[in-house]
Amino acid sequence: KNDPESKGTIALWQNIREFLDEEFPDAAMVSEWGDPQRSLEGGFHMDFLLEFGTSHSNDLFRCKEPYFSSRAKGNIYDFVESYKENCEKTAGKGLMCMFSGNHDVDRLARHLHGDELKVAFAFILSMPGAPFIYYGDEIGMRYVEGLKSVEGGYNRTGSRSPMQWDDST
């Protein structure tokens, strides 16, 4: 709070990184800030291009007509421009990562199906950085509609269900 430029937050995480490097030199710190420039400055080894803000990653996978959907009418240019800008600002400082999902967003399979999912995963897995696959996305796990919100889950609750195994595993 009251740290609009995150200077104090960055200093705190730099201190934690210093300790981590001394005690656990093989460990890696992963941020969920969605702001690689700031988080890498803060000492994290990697950060995501999250679905909010100016990354435009939502345009690829989760908007009304995502880029990787067969019905897509959008373009990839806003994402590419944001990605290039982030690459320039973070070059050599750490990894900027793509993710299939997390506990805060709809499941990928809620918006993409079949070959669309395959192409989206090919994209995620071939981008520079470290790909992050949210549990279940690798088997096309679906968003579970109608689950009761628990502990502030709201519309995210359907992405937080247990692994949906079936007889094919």
Predicted segment positions?
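Conserved alpha/beta catalytic core and glycan-binding cleft of carbohydrate-active enzymes
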Residues: W13, R17-D167
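Aromatic- and acidic-residue-enriched carbohydrate-binding clefts of CAZyme catalytic domains
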Residues: K1-K7
